[in-house]
Amino acid sequence: MTEQLIDIAALRREYTRGGLRRADLTAEPMDLFEQWLKQACAAQLPDATAMSVGTVDENGQPYQRLVLLKHFDRQGMVFYTNLGSRKAAHLAHNPRISLHFPWHVLERQVLVLGRAERLSVIEVMKYFHSRPRDSQIGAWVSRQSSRISSRGVLESKFLELKQKFAQGDVPLPSFWGGYRVSIEAMEFWQGGEHRMHDRFLYRRENGGWHIDRLAP
């Protein structure tokens, strides 16, 4: 490795956008999440719905990747993926999952812990056919996480399938689906001055939510 040109140990900034107090919290974590997501969208953060999805393989090796949140309500958070993907294989073995939303500009982050469950075909089909047509075709192209010789393989396959599906609706691939993450815990983090950040953890307890303030 060449000599490090950037002193990353010295890179830091103060967090000054405000704190998070217990009086700001909602009884349901999804209500606070909705407020924060709306503010992230209003601030025109790029990919405000992007979340890091953490899964674990059968050897205990954790993996992360960015995926877009496509729906949320009090039943959980929903995302879609190729069912032949690495993440799908992990979830088949171990449904425990983490989601992380990094909203750097707002000096906020949200951590979600829960369990993933496959969506019904009806739910998946409804969303699939709401996507742009080229995105529907793109879902057919990729056998996610498989090895390919070049990008040209994907581009050629896309053109082939675009011609094949030129007439009528693009069918739902059998290897494409979605997951709903039922939430067991959710942490809200707001940056604070002098590294005294505000953290609140919601945990399911006795049919409701128990809230703890955590030290930064």
UniProtKB/Swiss-Prot annotation:
It is an enzyme of class 1 (oxidoreductase). FMN binds at residues 65-70, 80-81, 86-87, 109, 144-145, 189, 199. Its EC number is 1.4.3.5. Its cofactor is FMN. InterPro entries: Pyridox_Oxase, Pyridox_Oxase_CS, Pyridox_Oxase_N, Pyridoxamine_oxidase_dimer_C, Split_barrel_FMN-bd. Keywords: Flavoprotein, FMN, Oxidoreductase, Pyridoxine biosynthesis. GO terms for molecular function: FMN binding; pyridoxamine phosphate oxidase activity. Belongs to the pyridoxamine 5'-phosphate oxidase family. This is Pyridoxine/pyridoxamine 5'-phosphate oxidase. It comes from Sodalis glossinidius (strain morsitans).
